[in-house]
Amino acid sequence: RALTTRRFAELSKTVLEENLSEAEAQERMGAEFRTPGHIPVCRESSGGLVTGQGHTELAVGLARLANLVPVVIGAEMLQPDGDGALSVANARIWASERNIPFLEGAEVIAAFHEQSQKPDASA
């Protein structure tokens, strides 16, 4: 899955840098990827964080804020026994123990709005 994700990001970067049309991008992507595949693909809503604040828009928005290719992979954290999602409190502990930042969606949205207010945000 890591190789698939890396190649998808590389190809997405190329598509964006070459400013390909939607048809050209679909052709380029379709030459290497098929659906269904072993990694579910989610697309952010048109307008990104301006029009939607779901997990996909938040993840892609975070990549954009970091000036990374807006291609991300999501994974659900599970309880140690594998029976259900990890609670937010336990996810915070897990992140803290590993010195990994833990962000709430509201923090990503606030950073997005702050950056969009900067004069050079459209550049």
Can you say where each PLM-predicted feature lies in the sequence?
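Catalytic domains of riboflavin
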Residues: R1-A123
